[in-house]
Amino acid sequence: MNNSQENRNISRRHFLGLAGGAVGMAAVASMGFPSSWAANNPEIDINNIEQQNNETDVLVIGGGMAGLFAAVKAHDAGSSTMLVSKGRLGSSGQTPFAKGIFAYDENNTTFSIDEFVEAISASALGTNNKAYTRQVAEHSLARVNELKEWGFFNSPLYHNSFNKPIEERNITVKERIVITHLIKEKGRIAGAAGFSLDEEKIHFFSAKSVILCTGAGGFKPNGFPICDLTHDGTVMAYNIGAKVTGKEWNDGHPGQVKNAAACFDGWHGMFEKKPEVTNVGIRHDLGVDLNYQAYVAGSPIKRGKPGEGMGNEIEGGPYVPDEFKHRKPTDTRPDSTDGRPPEGRKPSKEGEAPPGMAGELSGGSSAGMAIHKSEGLVPINDKCESNIPGLYAAGDALGSYMVGAIYTQIGSSLAGSAVQGAIAAEAAAEYCKGIKLQTISNSTINRIQEEILAPLKREAGYSPTWVTQTLQGIMIPNFVLYIKRENMLNAALAYIEELRDHHIPMLRAADMHELRLAHETANMILSAEMKLKASIMRKESRCSHYRLDYPEMDNENWQAWINIYKGENGSMQFEKQKFGSWPA
């Protein structure tokens, strides 16, 4: 061993001692350990970055299920259409990992559509938007039948089946382009902008209408395949004045303790499974019940056979309606006693746990994400339209509250994305008929270029990886994100505001990949601020939002959704929207 190698060897005890103060940190840095702050050494010549301009009637952002139907139906309605995706068509966001798609078929269920809507509302404790609940029931079967025609159910991989209707219609698809900005001119949408991951190129898209199919997002946690989802669409829309909602809710999917970061292992063969159709099966799942149990009694938690409890009963915790307590997961109705599995799904094998929930469980696997369809842009009607003229959203990018703020119907997420993509497309195409394509001003183009490339131009700064890890340490603890109380939320908020004010302006990037990470990190920080402030505002517990200091539902004051928007002075503003109403 040479002297250099010998000097870099350090015991754990010595490291912890050194890391305890500024002198220690300086010593650690001198030994060659990576530092959060460093000089930026770009691997590309910024002066050689090109610009490409694109024009279309309807611009669809996102290549998952919602994006597929948005592009196909906008084209079929007569609009020139372009689809742009950060990933690959059919391999973007959570779509490639969803293996159940709901279809309401009156011939295979005892529920009428009215009964289905009311059963969802009972489980969701009023948090669902009945217009969108009814919508998924009314249109899901038609979307499933189209997917059958395209070969969707023939393979565990979705690219080929998604590409079939796209190629048949000659729809332009641009992949591996990170959209960072939505563009508004004269009070309405005018397009979008971003950069290529594979070329040194900035893209500007002029469009009459934009449909966000960008999915939801999280904090790049271990265990759930959402590390390319960072609430990009929500943040871009918020920055141009769109209202967003649903930030206080949580998705409660657990991961596994063993190899917690191994998504493929943790979902026990689901990635290799062909998709299947599910029928009506109302439930009240994947809130923060397990998080509460871990908070009170410790962890890890071991999942038993289907229908078994989680061990000793724990007093208190999230409210579950009586009709959904101690139910087997094969019940078709809340009051079912015959134990028959829902149509379209096989009964679980003896001793088999639900997908991704076998063995010892670990929380936080989907940290930063809410229940599907319960966060995103606020719709002003049942056409997936936002408060920005010409801007629509579908799927997990739309805060439609389709099935509420708790997991109420298996397979509804994929179905809802298909249904909403089609509805948003038809509305966007109709909107395009009455307007002309706007010209994006040179001043806007220059400003956006500067904002996109800023991390590449910094001489020194913070690594987006380090800032993301810091964010995760602040937000993912069970006692911050899931089991909430005001003092902890405020404490976390102080750290997040520090990242917002001091670290975002100093993010650095050396190449196009790290540039993507820098923009994703900034989006996650803003989403974290929204989550904390909305959680502080909702002083009650309901569905997947639980407050230790307000453990009961407050139906007098909180039969309402929380909307968030950017004030005229740039500050984050909040408002209530009564359940069952449209925004004012």
PLM feature segments, named:
Residues 209-262, 407-427:
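Glycine-rich loop(s) and the adjacent beta-strand/alpha-helix scaffold that form part
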